[in-house]
């Protein structure tokens, strides 16, 4: 995999109650996205919030030569995964 995302998202009453977010393929070891988790817990689970959280998480990322594309790929993948989890949580 070029990048991977592992996530657990809990939503109650229109707010993120739980979030665990791990990223793979963008660092020498799996990366726990603690800043993104902290920002999102308590917020509304919108695509904009997801995007802002992963942008905050990756603001200091320093990709190796030839791997800069992985930062944008990670951003898009995180938002897509969290959107899917949110939509599943809302419909179940």
Question: Which functions belong to the PLM regions below?
Answer:
Residues 1-92:
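C-terminal structural segment of proteins
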């Amino acid at each position: 995999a070029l990048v991977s995302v592992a996530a657990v998202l809990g939503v109650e009453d229109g707010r993120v109650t739980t979030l665990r977010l791990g990223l793979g393929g963008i660092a020498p070891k799996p990366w726990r996205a603690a800043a993104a988790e902290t920002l999102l817990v308590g917020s509304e689970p919108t695509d904009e919030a997801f995007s802002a959280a992963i942008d905050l998480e990756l603001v200091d990322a320093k990709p190796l030569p030839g791997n800069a594309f992985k930062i944008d790929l990670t951003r898009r993948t995180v938002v897509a995964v969290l959107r899917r989890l949110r939509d599943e949580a809302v419909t179940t």
